[in-house]
Amino acid sequence: MNELIAMSAVLLSVLLQAGVPPLRSVEKGTQSQVDVQRQVTVRDATEWTSLWHAHAWDRPEPAVDFSRDMVVGVFMGSRPTAGFTVEIVGYLDAGNGVVVRYRETMPDRGALTAQILVSPYHLVAIPRRTGVVTFEKVQSTK
């Protein structure tokens, strides 16, 4: 029964995404210098440079063409062990805006994990929009 529900959710997601241009992953990882949970929308190069400096001050920011794209991202914040991740799984045009869908995963209870601080994040480029951007956390299929 759970498999049927999961398959239905995937099918619905695919149907809702039909006609929406794909997202492009700019960077994803577990070692951001942004150690608080936050979602971001970046529409110009000045904002991008500022965000990138907070996220990874020791590296140059990846190129983004803000005349046609914008960057959306999710920072999970500081977590106590390895095994935490965040992934932007898609986006939907929603009237005058965009809904960005993301999934967080965490280690299973009792799992053996490296005892290191992590700060998972995912930054993606999507076609530029002028409306409001909202973020929706979706359930893991695990």
Task: Report residues per predicted region.
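Exposed, flexible binding/inhibitory loops of compact, secreted disulfide-stabilized domains
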Residues: 14-142
